[in-house]
Amino acid sequence: MSTEQTSADQTSTEHSTQQPTAQPGRPEVAAAGEWTFPEPRVRELPNGLTALVLDVPGQYVTSVRLTLPLPLRAEPRELEGVAWVMAGLLDEGTQQHDQRELSEMLERLGVGIGAGMSEGSLGVDLDVPQRHLGEALTLMTEIVREPAFAPGEVTRAVRTRLQDIEQERASAPHRAMRQLAATYYDPQTRASRPGAGSAQSVAAITRDDVVAFHREHVHPHGGTVVVAGDLTDVDVDVLLEASLGSWTTPGPAQEWERVPAPRAQDAARVVLVDRPGSVQSELILATSGPDRRAPRWPAFPVLGYVIGGAPNARIDAVLREEKGYTYGIRSGFRPRQVGGTFVVSGSVRADATVDSLRLLDEILRGVADGVTPVEATSGVDFMTLTAPGRYATADALADELAHLAADGLPLTFTSDTVAAMRRLTPEDLDAAWREDVGTDWTVVVVGDASAYRDEVEALGIGPVSVVPA
């Protein structure tokens, strides 16, 4: 044996007998700490507006949210859609500045502004760099107090809305939602009709109608303005009093009570919206659910996540991952001012329509058998551990505060809900589903009805009817 070989063998033996170097242990991941939604400073302005002011250091774009009580049911039946037309025209010129001048002023200040309607309120959203907050609030006040509603702008807004209605009719998801509202709700309630109006009612809207609706229904009293951002060296109270706090209207504001939207007596049925030749089907299933005042409300966002809020939730685990019928179907609770709905929606391959409905029926009925501990933990963790990220920016904080104001909920609601979620058990989730979620479903399918009507009837999930697209 050569000297080199002997040396190599000795070296190999030495290496093989050496003890491995100890590796430092991995750092332990600490449990997430308690999180609470920041509480704003509350101030009442002279004209009846409530101001919620939230200092968010480091957020140099300031978010302002103005929420005024104004339900859609305030619209005359023959002019439904006038509220949305009015809201969309607020930033299209004022009595002091025409549309072009106003646009240039907003652009120079870096202001983003928009307005829209919800079930119970008019909302005006504004975002602006902190240094221009005072000027932006002055313009916001001008916009809500004295919009011009120029005849040409009103005509354009009405035409645009009519075009949107045609486009929505061609969109399967929009068509499905419109049919769901018409089928689910009592035909006498406002919720059964399109929130932004029908083609017939929108076409009837004139400038005089828009002016009259604004004059009668847009008042500061009872409203809320939220200001959130880095407010270092900013005297928000002075800015608000000089702007929105100085806004007054001649007439008294009407007091609006929260009222339920009754369900139709024949809502538990299947409606096939016929679109011949469709290669996929849009599905929507809905039943009754709670509003955010329900004692068990913290359980429902978790249930929505477990059932259909993620790719690994019960619905997609079967219809997407196992069957390959869909790119994704989602579910969630949709609270209203009083009561609410639980909605499942998504699209599937046309040839999988019947089996998808069968599987959804099985999955939804199976929730009554109970939520597993793993599912409960997963849902609770997602909803609670992502909360700090969801509310990390000034605009998200302002949005949530505006929603709380619109719903008349306490400022501690979000923190209380997250804290209650952390304590949820599988038994709590089971009780919430059993006690507060309906068992009779409204089902809408948009697709080629001739391809599966008989098979859908054979499923026995409800009486079946067909309507044209």
Q: Which residues does each PLM region occupy?
A:
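Residues that act as N-cap/strand-start positions at coil-to-secondary-structure junctions
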Residues: 36-37, 107, 267, 427
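Short, surface-exposed beta-strand/loop micro-motifs that present aromatic residues
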Residues: 41, 50-55, 212-215, 267-274, ...
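His/Glu-based metal-binding/catalytic segments typifying zinc-dependent metallopeptidases
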Residues: 54-70, 80, 182, 252-312
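Short, charged, low-complexity patches
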Residues: 79, 83, 133, 137, ...
